[in-house]
Amino acid sequence: MQEIENLHQSVLLQEVLQAFTPLEEGVLIDCTLGLGGHSKALLSQKPHLKLIGIDKDKFAQEIAKERLKAFEGRYNLLSGGFAKRFKEALETHNKEIKGVLVDLGVSSLQLDDDDRGFNFHSHALDMRMDLKSDLNAQKVINSYPVIALEKIFRDYGEIKEYKKIAHKIAERRTKKPFKDAKDLSEFLSSFSKNKKIHPATLVFQAVRIEVNSELEELKEFLQCARNLKGAILCVISFHSLEDGLVKNAFKDYAKNCICDPLSFKCACSNNHALGEILTKKPITPSPEEIKNNRRSRSAKMRVFKFKP
């Protein structure tokens, strides 16, 4: 277990604890439990807090369960997509929920596991968070029509040369289908000129988002979260697409006026804000954290406090 503690470092851990300082009791929902690092720290710090942990990765959940053993009776772990499970928990525990945490990152355990296909050297081409899901990265790369590849590279990877990359992949797979992540990564590196990041980074991001329906799930969650009352919502994102959705949702939550933007005069009484944004700018990792954990460098945390 100590090996897991050393392997996976929870991103922005102290900042998360700070965000939930007002919480003393009630229920906190960790929508993306992962290996349970944030949850363990929160349960340790707050003896009267109860936890609902959600994750679609069964293997990660087993590890989290072992790490949370000391808090038996104070937590309940649920399997599945966090948007659906959060909605169910909200319907059952609405008044008790005092905090909600969403960490949208991929864990180090998943990234480093060569059987999962998340890293550039993996001997699998999978990328599924839920191993029961039918769609995997191999199906996307080897079977999607060129126009579909173009769309996900453009929309989910924000890749400038999305057409070129999609066509090159399609051309190569007709001769020899891609067998694993290493094969795909080396192929992308053979013609990409991107010197700032690894040539495969944005393609892998786009495919992972597609395989796991990540943005759709986040949108569904943010819509459902509007129904929270008196709770603190903390979301950690890792790329601009996620952060943009969270930023805009929080702005929408905080709007007092819900009149048509084209209206000349407010007719809604101008008091419809669901709460307030507690982070005018996103919280980012300290230089020290980035030095100790390079994978934290793109993390951004936003916090919203809902009215009772």
Swiss-Prot record:
Question: What EC designation does it have?
Answer: 2.1.1.199
Is Iron-sulfur one of the keywords UniProt gives this record? no
Q: Which domain of life is it from?
A: Bacteria
User: What's its catalytic activity?
Assistant: cytidine(1402) in 16S rRNA + S-adenosyl-L-methionine = N(4)-methylcytidine(1402) in 16S rRNA + S-adenosyl-L-homocysteine + H(+)
An individual GO BP term: rRNA base methylation
According to the UniProt entry, its GO molecular function terms are: rRNA (cytosine-N4-)-methyltransferase activity
Q: Which GO terms describe its cellular component?
A: cytoplasm
- Keyword annotations from UniProtKB, A to Z: Cytoplasm, Methyltransferase, rRNA processing, S-adenosyl-L-methionine, Transferase
Query: Where is this protein localized, as stated in its record?
Result: Cytoplasm
Q: For binding S-adenosyl-L-methionine, which residues are annotated in this chain's numbering?
A: 36-38, 55, 86, 103, 110
What's the stated role of this polypeptide? Specifically methylates the N4 position of cytidine in position 1402 (C1402) of 16S rRNA.
Similarity-based family = Belongs to the methyltransferase superfamily. RsmH family.
Please give the name of this protein: Ribosomal RNA small subunit methyltransferase H
The gene for this chain is rsmH
